[in-house]
A protein has these predicted regions:
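Hydrophobic alpha-helical segments
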Residues: 3-4, 8-12, 16, 29-139
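Aromatic-anchored segments of alpha-helical transmembrane domains
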Residues: 18, 87-94, 156-165
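Helix-to-loop transition at the C-terminal end of transmembrane segments
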Residues: 22-27, 167-168
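Internal/C-terminal transmembrane anchor helices
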Residues: 143-168
């Protein structure tokens, strides 16, 4: 059984993921521009369509994972997905700190601009909260039916919102 402190840490990280993902989904064009900037930074051939699609997919995935953490759905799986995503975000923000390109992180889409150092510190704090929330491995709860229903509703609304934002 997860303690209240661990649940609060999981909810805090989940809410950051939800807000970050929704802000990316709200502005698919802006998110696509951010992804294109990352393509240039990483020397990947850029494509506006691929960048826009990847931006929306990233926003939907972040929001979905965030809702799963908030509602404590599949905690054994979610902890590994979040740890992997957060590790990738942290390494990418470390690269931004080291090479200091003329771009912002895009963590919260075009809505909130953070410096490279602010992004890196945010990612370190989130990584710490993840470790507090989900480790040791055997401390998880069993998901209840209402959690599945709430999570599924949240995912459906997020995907619907993403489709609406894409076309309008």
């Amino acid at each position: 059984m997860m303690s209240k402190y661990k649940k609060c840490c999981a909810i805090a990280v989940g809410l950051v993921y939800v807000v970050s993902g929704l802000l990316k989904v709200m502005d698919p064009v802006g998110t696509g521009l951010i992804v294109e900037a990352y393509f240039r930074f990483l020397h990947i051939p850029e494509s506006a369509l691929v960048a826009n699609i990847l931006g929306v997919v990233l926003g939907v995935v972040e929001t979905t994972i965030g809702f799963a953490a908030v509602f404590c759905v599949w905690p054994r799986i979610i902890r590994w997905i979040m740890l992997g995503m957060q590790s990738a975000f942290t390494l990418l923000s470390l690269a931004l700190v080291i090479w200091n390109p003329q771009m912002h992180c895009g963590c919260f889409g075009e809505a909130i601009h953070l410096t490279h150092w602010q992004t890196f510190i945010k990612n370190i704090v989130l990584m710490g909260l993840l470790w507090v929330a989900y480790f040791p491995l055997w401390e998880t709860t069993k998901t209840k039916m209402w959690q599945y229903i709430t999570f599924a509703s949240s995912v459906i609304l997020t995907v619907g919102f993403a489709v609406y934002s894409w076309y309008y």
